[in-house]
Amino acid sequence: MSEADNKPVSATVELIAQDRPEHRPEHRFSSRSIRSFVLRQGRMSGAQQRYLEDMLPKIGIEYRPAPLDLDDAFGRSAPKILEIGFGMGETTAKIAAAHPEQDYLGIEVHGPGVGAMCKLVAENGLANVRIMQHDAVEVMRDMIADGALAGVHVFFPDPWRKARHYKRRLIQPDFVALVAQKLAPGGYLHCATDWEHYAHWMLEILAAEPLLQNTADGFAPRPDYRPLTKFENRGLKLGHGVWDLVFRRR
């Protein structure tokens, strides 16, 4: 365990909390100088590129600093679930296929992941998936109406393990407050991580948000709708932990 992990989570979270709007002249989201990701596009395969070029014009939504009509974007009225950082798309595709009665808006900044997700959507005929390739904080802030979401998934975000990088973690007090604002009453925020320090960090921040209520006594059992990933299965066999948190909007 690193020296950073030996520091009390509460003390570190308090330092981050001092960066909330009431402690600064400008809202932290008004200028996105600190982001929770580093844009490393990597190499896109030929198949990913082809599917991206073919599918993104059909299922992609461009970022605009204006409210998005989600029902219009999906062509129907149904519960809307937003997933932040869908990676290569396997989990999102499995959940969307298992729940055709719900619509899924996936956000990912990395091109190969977007291409892979486009491929999965095409191969599985998923009519209930839309994709955005943009900063999720800006999408949430500028395009999602208050109370519009039935759920938000944040699965295995970058833990930013070094203490000096904690400010880059996606789960921060201000962001959780923003997510809670976008959830409909009874809607949920589901986070999952395989990094223990980040798990406790998440738990403390989510528990401190007055609009959210924990559905469990601490960490939650993995909900049936979240499939195990290959990486997660391998880690569990090696004795590594995975922590789920599910909070509902009051």
Curated annotation (Swiss-Prot):
This is tRNA (guanine-N(7)-)-methyltransferase. It catalyses: guanosine(46) in tRNA + S-adenosyl-L-methionine = N(7)-methylguanosine(46) in tRNA + S-adenosyl-L-homocysteine. Catalyzes the formation of N(7)-methylguanine at position 46 (m7G46) in tRNA. The gene is trmB. Its EC number is 2.1.1.33. S-adenosyl-L-methionine binds at E83, E108, D135, D158. It comes from the Bacteria. Disulfide bonds: none annotated. PANTHER family: 3-DEOXY-D-MANNO-OCTULOSONIC-ACID TRANSFERASE/TRNA GUANINE-N 7 - -METHYLTRANSFERASE (PTHR23417), PENTACOTRIPEPTIDE-REPEAT REGION OF PRORP DOMAIN-CONTAINING PROTEIN (PTHR23417:SF14). It comes from Azoarcus sp. (strain BH72).
